[in-house]
């Protein structure tokens, strides 16, 4: 049985569709720009569409005004998206329908296990509540993992093998506190938007096999994946909002754009510094080479908090 019409979307359009999907937990930093720029260039080089989605489904982590700031930052750096911005906070009806369908098909169940219990058995959930028939009160919802995905092909990195225990785990798709889990929301929305290739940071390699397993449960076509190198500070830690990576500069965006292109292994034209933002991006699209992108790189202290 296929998912209901609202969820099932026959993908007849063969146009390339990419996306950038930040969470509004703070302003964009250099690491964020790498993900945005890489996904933008891959989409434009394929003559495709580039969408922006704001993943605002976790209010406790959100910073007031951050979403609007992120959109202004993208525009300031010349990264103009196609169509309307999709806000996950306006998509709860879709996630509820997805949860209902999975429950009706016997593909999910309620779980009352605490984090403390799961940590006490090694951190990987053991399926304790699978046959206990709990109700929804004070419970999370877990996927009933039947056909775990243990590997996938990354268009940049080749075949990536997942940790077997992690791949087989019945992971959470609706949290005990009532919030929708990232893995469910991202799959439902990427399918809804017709995303054909997901270009994002390498820190999201781990959940990819879980997301692919959800695509398969819903009977949807799985998109291609590219995981870009992470921008690291001089200490080898990923640039992130958690380690206080500085926000993108508000001044002339061109030096930062050029640094981001060089980080992605792209060949700099002789007079890039004399180009406008639009000219830099046009040239970058024309000369984009995914095969030149490195696996990882360290950025200089201009873009990282060297004290972290």
UniProtKB/Swiss-Prot annotation:
InterPro entries per UniProt: Glu-Q_tRNA(Asp)_Synthase, Glu/Gln-tRNA-synth, Glu/Gln-tRNA-synth_Ib_cat-dom, GluQ/Sye, Rossmann-like_a/b/a_fold
Keyword Nucleotide-binding: yes
Binding, ATP: 241
GO MF terms held by the record: ATP binding; glutamate-tRNA ligase activity; zinc ion binding
Binding site for Zn(2+): 111, 113, 125, 129
'HIGH' region, short sequence motif: residues: 22-32
EC category name: ligase
EC number(s) per entry: 6.1.1.-
Cofactor note: Binds 1 zinc ion per subunit.
Annotated positions binding L-glutamate: 19-23, 55, 182, 200
Record-level GO BP terms: glutamyl-tRNA aminoacylation; tRNA modification
A single GO cellular-component term on record: cytosol
Cofactor dependency: Zn(2+)
Keywords of the record: Aminoacyl-tRNA synthetase, ATP-binding, Ligase, Metal-binding, Nucleotide-binding, Zinc
Residue positions of motif 'KMSKS' region: 238-242
Gene3D superfamilies, per the entry: HUPs
Nucleotide-binding in keyword set: yes
Family as reported in the entry's similarity comment: Belongs to the class-I aminoacyl-tRNA synthetase family. GluQ subfamily.
Function: Catalyzes the tRNA-independent activation of glutamate in presence of ATP and the subsequent transfer of glutamate onto a tRNA(Asp). Glutamate is transferred on the 2-amino-5-(4,5-dihydroxy-2-cyclopenten-1-yl) moiety of the queuosine in the wobble position of the QUC anticodon.
Protein name, per record: Glutamyl-Q tRNA(Asp) synthetase
Classification lineage: Bacteria, Pseudomonadati, Pseudomonadota, Gammaproteobacteria, Enterobacterales
């Amino acid at each position: 049985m296929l998912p209901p019409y609202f969820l099932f979307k026959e993908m007849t359009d063969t146009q390339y569709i990419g996306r950038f999907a930040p969470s509004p937990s703070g302003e964009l930093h250099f690491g964020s720009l790498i993900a945005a720029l890489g996904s933008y260039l891959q989409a434009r080089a394929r003559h495709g569409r580039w969408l922006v989605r704001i993943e605002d489904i976790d209010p406790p982590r959100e910073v007031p005004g951050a979403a609007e700031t992120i959109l202004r930052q993208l525009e300031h750096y010349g990264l103009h998206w196609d169509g309307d911005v999709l806000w996950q906070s306006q998509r709860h009806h879709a996630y509820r329908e997805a949860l209902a369908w999975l429950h009706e098909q016997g593909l999910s169940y309620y779980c009352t296990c605490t984090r403390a219990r799961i940590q006490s058995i090694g951190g990987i959930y053991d399926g304790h509540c699978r046959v206990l028939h709990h109700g929804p009160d004070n419970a999370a919802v877990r996927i009933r993992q039947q056909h775990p995905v243990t590997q996938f092909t990354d268009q940049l990195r080749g075949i990536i093998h997942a940790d077997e225990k992690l791949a087989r785990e019945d992971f959470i798709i609706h949290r005990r506190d009532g919030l929708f889990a990232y893995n469910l929301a991202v799959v439902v929305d990427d399918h809804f938007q017709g995303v054909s290739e997901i270009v994002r940071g390498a820190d999201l390699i781990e959940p990819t096999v879980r997301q692919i397993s959800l695509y398969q449960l819903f009977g949807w076509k799985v998109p291609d994946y590219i995981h870009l190198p992470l921008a690291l500070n001089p200490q080898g830690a990923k640039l992130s909002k958690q380690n206080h990576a500085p926000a993108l500069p508000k001044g002339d965006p061109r030096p930062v754009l050029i640094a981001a292109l060089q980080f992605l292994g792209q060949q700099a034209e002789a007079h890039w510094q004399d180009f406008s933002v639009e000219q830099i991006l046009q040239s970058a699209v024309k000369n984009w080479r995914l095969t030149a992108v490195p696996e990882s790189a360290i950025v200089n202290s201009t873009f990282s908090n060297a004290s972290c």
